[in-house]
Amino acid sequence: MNVRARLAPTPSGYLHWGNLLNFTLTWVHTRRAGGVLALRIDDLDAARARPEYISDIFETLQWLGFDWDEGPRSPQDFQQHFSQAARTEEYRRWVTRFPGYACDCSRQAVKARTAEFYDGFCRTRGLQLALDKTQWRLLSKKPQDDIVLWRKEDAPAYHLVSLVEDL
């Protein structure tokens, strides 16, 4: 079995004990299996990502003595070649490759109809995708599993970015 794993911290704060435990378990498992380990920094939320948090990721991994096979080697390499926040156009090209539908429901509207989950309201409405006015939902077997891949704010959703990055 070929093992591929990733460390995927979010630079919205300094790393914490949960990150360190996850990194340790992932690193040990991947190295014991002779697998490939990637570093993917999830900076999609550009408003909360800060340079000092990105630097902390590299400093902590170096301090722990962890290596990785793929991904950025430094904060500068990350900003120049790997930043998700700078790759919106790439994600835009991917979004409609997945079976789905446009949806203009707000969270408030969904909550008013059903407090538990998305009810599939837009599945058959035939809305046209307008990346700045509608979201793109992945069509799945059950409406509550129709996750958002593109947000109304004309930005990729975390699920889409994670999927594209892991391909």
Label each residue range with its predicted role.
Residues 1-119, 126:
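N-terminal Rossmann-like or analogous alpha/beta NTP/dinucleotide-binding catalytic cores
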